Each structure stands twice: as structure tokens, then as C-alpha cells.
Amino acid sequence: MANVYDLANELERAVRALPEYQAVLTAKAAIESDADAQVLWQDFLATQSKVQEMMQSGQMPSQEEQDEMSKLGEKIESNDLLKVYFDQQQRLSVYMSDIEKIVFAPMQDLM
């Protein structure tokens, strides 16, 4: 029987070799080489982190914060580089979701 850690490492390498993973890397590099896209990306990450912290503490974003997030979403949608990045992330997430179901199936059997 193969070592479970060896199999996990093999899975990691297989994910990195997926064309969808490579497409996300390419899209990320494009964002990093464009100043406008990079600023929007950093704003998105900061906003996402702020909202997650609020929700974890049981708070909801104010109307003003929701409006800011909506405006940021519109800016992101209008930036071709970020749009491509999120589209590629979505394609990759399909694989990751399927893999997660497979890997966690034994745990479901125990519940």
C-alpha cells in the first residue's frame, strides 16, 4: 500500500500541473504586472479580510460598507485582468471541490 503522504504529495503535484492551475498563475502574473489591476486586487483583499473579520465577530457590514463593496465589485468586473483571474479561479475551484469531496468521503462515513 502506498504511503498516504506520498499520495498527498503526488496529488499536490498533479493539481499544480493542471491547465486550469497554470491559467490562474498566468492571470495572477498579469495582475502583478499591471499597476491598476494590482491596486484593485489589494483593495479587494483588504475588503474581503475586513468583511470576514466582521462576520466572524457577528457583525454585518453597514450600508456604507456594502455600497463600497458594490463599487469595488463593479471596478473589478470592468478590469479585464481581474475578470480573467476570477474566471480562471472558478474553473480551478471545480476541480478542488471534486477533490475535496473525494478526500473527505472517508470522514463522512464516520459520521
From Swiss-Prot:
Q: What's the name of the protein?
A: UPF0342 protein SAK_1409
Q: What is the lineage of its organism?
A: Bacteria, Bacillati, Bacillota, Bacilli, Lactobacillales
Note the Pfam families from the entry.
Com_YlbF
**NCBIfam families in the record, alphabetically?**
PRK13676.1-1 (NF010209)
What does the similarity note say? Belongs to the UPF0342 family.
